[in-house]
């Protein structure tokens, strides 16, 4: 079982992911851990844009948007993830995981959102920055995530139909959000039997 978590900037994606990983005793992969794994396996230099979140704006990005679902660029997320984590059960934060595993039955694709004010305050606390800096982080990060996701998937980032479950983590908190995801996984597993 894989659970992929995409999220708006300032949501508790890493924290929710860690709670889930601890509960089901599987590894948590995010940009940092995947980048470290790619370095160890010697593939980081082959996919610098995939680990960067800034491929858009290049000529290749424009071509990739119109190159069809089976383009080399659109296959990159799955190819990289297969090389790094294979069939391992895990929690995967970002990296277009929802797209990479969209055709798999044993995957739950989650998108976390939150009210802007809560996300700003979370970033202010987490990064010890002022309000205007947190707002700038949100704008810059979300712009990059949208471009990154479109570049690698041809899909709109955050569009509900691309996920199995969309949750406002502001309403439920970290533990409550993890509870909802776990209940969804449990219900899906029960239906498959």
Question: What are the residue ranges of the model-derived segments?
Answer:
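Small-molecule kinase domains that catalyze NTP-dependent phosphoryl transfer to phosphate-bearing small molecules
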Residues: 56-58, 130-175
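Short, amphipathic alpha-helical "lid/cap" segments that border enzyme active or binding sites
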Residues: 78, 174-182
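Short loop/helix-cap segments at secondary-structure boundaries that form the rim of catalytic
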Residues: 99-105, 160
